Amino acid sequence: MRTGSALVAGGAVLAAGAPLVASLQPLRRALTPAVLPDRLSGVSTSRHIALTFDDGPDPGSTPGFLDLLAERDVRATFFLLGRYAVAEPALVRRMAEAGHEIGVHGWTHRCVVRLGPRRLADDLRATKRVIEELTERPTRWYRPPYGVLTTHALVAARSAGLSTVLWSAWGADWRRGRSAAQVVTTVTRGLRPGGTVLLHDTDRTSAPGSWRTTLTATERLLDAWAERDIAVGPLAEHWVG
């Protein structure tokens, strides 16, 4: 494995050519939040849960999530891919007008390891520009596809004025054959107070039709959190207070 310049983050060394693959759950359990900085792992000191969705916008599925969140009066953070945002301007505007926070997920869903530093930096700036032009609001967050971190990804995000944030619990909802109950169980098992949840509002990079399972699971999770009087919202509210 090649080595190169490295960034030491809370004890974790992220070397160029030696990416930290945060999407591998055993590794995440070992690193988050024990090793990764709280902000990077999406962990706050409050009981607030940050609800986040990746890979949209998708006109075939995202509206269902927006409708559900509107019914429950809940806002979330959506990490968008630039190629789809530019193709669905009305949907992006609807997200923003509903009070949801919008972050950068990249121009496409390519792993950052496959992009050179300059290409990645250009992609992030282009995606941020599209989102900000459509929403007329500043964009703050970046989440790399697959949760793969490299030093050049962190540097590119910072140069674009973005803060990188991962997640502390997920539903593995992109997998084929998952039930809503399984997604809920997986989220609940990994979630702690102050955590950030990762789900997907589209099946563009997931198993076909998986978004329907995620939508049902999201409804059940919102019900459970409401019963426990746990505040749920976007990352913008996660470190407030």
Task: Give, region by region, the residue ranges found by the protein language model.
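N-terminal membrane-anchoring alpha-helices
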Residues: 1-40
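Charged helix-capping and loop-helix junction motifs
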Residues: 93, 120-124, 178-185, 211-218
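A short acidic, helix-capping loop that chelates divalent metal ions and anchors anionic groups
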Residues: 110-115, 173-175, 204-208
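Hydrophobic, well-structured mid-protein blocks that either form specific transmembrane helices
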Residues: 114-149, 153-156
